[in-house]
């Protein structure tokens, strides 16, 4: 038995650092119309303002992606997986059935292989599928006028109790570039957006552990975190750890991009322990099944992979259906030809067979599979630019136009769909991408990798890309795929995952502020108030990364007394602008009267000066 196998057999607990509650925070649940709709949020408890400005500060509620991992009342056992949230809702709709056997040949082969027992997730669930090839997608329900429990859950979650603060805290006016963001998100608004294809709810019926979330430009900007093994490294336990770590810091969805060993088993462990939607690129595993030879790929093997992953519970598939034979020659004169793994695989297949890809020709067959499990399309940008010199070229935009055509086909089948975008794009060319996507794809949600705005900073591409991510998020991009410092350099570790997610949480939040998303500024204002009042602990705790903020402060002022001091090590006690401003704010009425009297006299002298032709010296004889 390998060391990895031994570890898996005993893998029940999560690293304590991954699940400890955030400081001064409570996990709260807001109940919906029935008891089984319990929407999680994080409540940040604030200290009172003291001194002459004394007042109580209400707690701040923030969107929480960490699932039950940060709930001290829930015992986590990775071997058993998470509890089901949506099973009852799915059963009550009475349009699915539990299968008597797995539908995928590959799944059955893996299950029958006794040598894999040491790697297998122990508590495998029996998958569901729509009855009689019915449609069980959230889009189908939305078009029927049905508000599902998932939609109600999302409405509560998106509002995040911000209405409690609306009379207390102001917000700058935003520019939403034609988005339609209401003051209050209602269940009906969620239904309407999904029915029109402007938003998606990735929620496979075989992933009932998910806490429902939504992706669309009229909702908060979301971020995705990538994990996954490679042929050169990582293990099942490391990938599960990365998933838990990623959602702690704010990943709204996770993509498992595994290309190494035991992809099937790795994915099962991740899905069963994930409270957020899981996405994959099915062509990666399909390629593994044909021993890495792209020319040997077939529709039959790909179809079996789709069914295998749908029955495991994958919530969205990246499908590179827009890589058409006619677009491949357009990439020849690029500096960096085709950088998408999936795109390059399909381009090679198209050239080898000199025909359109089986993904493109069988697209409606794929829709038939997706709708029976409610798997969402993430239509992949296989021809995205890999450097800023290649941005916005004919290959990229030709593929985007095809994705728009495929979106309409998916919608005809009531299959939820969003669109993937670049890539590497300089700042002045980003808005063109967003505008063209909205036009070509009928306002289907856009999901971009950055984009990276410059190519000169290996090791810092979480920054080069977060700049572009904030910008395109402002213009209307619905979800941002994070980039880590290891981009272009290697497989990210846990610290890289955190760095990438924090950079993208900043970008997404900055975009929400710029759009004028209701309630987006509450946290900023609360932190600013804490900063002005020298409530250091509140400053740390309101931040996206309290641990790092506290660490940086304590490097120069480590003593507990420094947590109440009215200065930091940057300015010291004599030059703190906020301390001086506080003193100005506490000037008494008598002093203010003196200042006003002086101003009146100054105004008189000014008028007298102007009356005398604005001359510094009096003219002779005057």
UniProtKB/Swiss-Prot annotation:
GO molecular-function terms, A-Z: 4 iron, 4 sulfur cluster binding; carbon-carbon lyase activity; zinc ion binding
Catalyzed reactions: 5-amino-1-(5-phospho-beta-D-ribosyl)imidazole + S-adenosyl-L-methionine = 4-amino-2-methyl-5-(phosphooxymethyl)pyrimidine + CO + 5'-deoxyadenosine + formate + L-methionine + 3 H(+)
Claim: Lipid metabolism is one of the keywords in the record: no
Example of a GO biological process term: thiamine biosynthetic process
InterPro entries, per database record: ThiC, ThiC-associated_dom, ThiC/Bza_core_dom, ThiC/BzaA/B
Enzyme Commission designation: 4.1.99.17
Cofactors, names only: [4Fe-4S] cluster
Binding site for Zn(2+): 424, 488
Binding note for cofactor: Binds 1 [4Fe-4S] cluster per subunit. The cluster is coordinated with 3 cysteines and an exchangeable S-adenosyl-L-methionine.
Oligomer status and interactors: Homodimer.
Family: Belongs to the ThiC family.
HAMAP family assigned to the protein according to its UniProt record, in alphabetical order: ThiC
Name this protein carries in UniProt: Phosphomethylpyrimidine synthase
Originating organism: Ruthia magnifica subsp. Calyptogena magnifica
């Amino acid at each position: 038995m390998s060391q990895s196998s031994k570890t898996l057999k005993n893998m029940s607990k999560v690293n304590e650092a991954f699940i400890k509650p955030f400081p001064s925070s409570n996990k709260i649940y807001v109940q919906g119309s029935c008891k089984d709709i319990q929407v999680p949020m994080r409540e940040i408890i604030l200290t009172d303002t003291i001194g002459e400005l004394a007042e109580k500060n209400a707690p701040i509620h923030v969107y929480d992606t960490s699932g039950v991992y940060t709930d001290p009342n829930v015992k986590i056992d990775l071997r058993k997986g998470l509890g089901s949230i949506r099973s009852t809702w799915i059963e009550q709709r009475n349009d699915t059935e539990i299968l008597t056997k797995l539908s995928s040949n590959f799944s059955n082969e893996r299950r029958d292989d006794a040598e894999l027992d040491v790697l297998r997730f122990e508590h495998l669930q029996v998958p569901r599928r729509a009855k009689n090839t019915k449609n069980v997608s959230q889009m189908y329900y939305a078009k029927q006028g049905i508000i599902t429990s998932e939609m109600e859950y999302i409405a509560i979650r998106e509002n995040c109790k911000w209405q409690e603060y609306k009379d207390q805290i102001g917000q700058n006016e935003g520019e939403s570039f034609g988005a339609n963001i209401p003051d209050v998100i209602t269940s009906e608004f969620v239904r309407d957006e999904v029915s029109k294809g402007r938003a998606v709810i990735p929620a496979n019926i075989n992933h009932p552990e998910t806490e429902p979330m939504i992706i669309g430009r009229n909702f908060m900007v979301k971020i995705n975190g990538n994990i996954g093994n490679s042929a050169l490294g990582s293990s099942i336990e490391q990938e599960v750890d990365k998933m838990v770590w990623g959602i702690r810091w704010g990943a709204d969805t996770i993509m498992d991009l595994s290309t190494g060993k035991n992809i099937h088993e790795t994915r099962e462990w991740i899905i069963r322990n994930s409270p957020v939607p899981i996405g994959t690129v099915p062509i990666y595993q399909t390629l593994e099944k044909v021993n890495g030879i792209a020319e040997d790929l077939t529709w039959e093997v790909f179809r079996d992979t789709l069914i295998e992953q749908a029955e495991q519970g994958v919530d969205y598939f990246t499908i590179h259906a827009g890589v058409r034979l006619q677009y491949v020659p357009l990439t020849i004169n690029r500096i960096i030809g085709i950088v998408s793994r999936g795109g390059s695989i399909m381009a090679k297949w198209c050239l080898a067979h000199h025909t359109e890809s089986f993904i493109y020709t069988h697209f409606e067959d794929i829709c038939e599979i997706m709708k029976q499990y409610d798997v969402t399309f993430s239509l992949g940008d296989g021809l995205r630019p890999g450097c800023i010199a290649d941005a916005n070229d004919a290959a990229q935009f030709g593929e985007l136009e095809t994705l728009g055509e495929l979106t309409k086909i998916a919608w005809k089948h009531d299959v939820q769909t969003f669109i993937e975008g670049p890539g590497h794009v300089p700042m002045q060319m980003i808005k063109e991408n967003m505008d063209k996507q909205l036009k070509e794809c009928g306002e289907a949600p856009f999901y971009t990798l950055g984009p990276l705005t410059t190519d000169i900073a290996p090791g810092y591409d979480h920054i080069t890309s977060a700049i572009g991510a904030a910008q395109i998020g402002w213009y209307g991009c619905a979800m941002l795929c994070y980039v880590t410092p290891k981009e272009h350099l290697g497989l990210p570790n846990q610290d890289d995952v955190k760095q990438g997610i924090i950079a993208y949480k900043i970008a997404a939040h900055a975009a929400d502020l710029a759009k004028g998303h209701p309630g987006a500024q509450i946290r900023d204002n609360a932190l600013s108030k804490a900063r002005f009042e020298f409530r250091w602990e509140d400053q740390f705790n309101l931040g996206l990364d309290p641990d790092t903020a506290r660490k940086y402060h304590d490097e120069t002022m480590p003593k507990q007394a420094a947590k109440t001091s009215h200065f930091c090590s940057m300015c010291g006690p004599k030059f703190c602008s906020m301390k001086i401003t506080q003193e100005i704010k506490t000037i008494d009425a008598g002093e203010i009267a003196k200042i006003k009297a002086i101003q009146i006299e100054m105004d008189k002298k000014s008028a007298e000066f102007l009356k005398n032709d604005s001359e510094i010296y009096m003219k002779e004889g005057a």
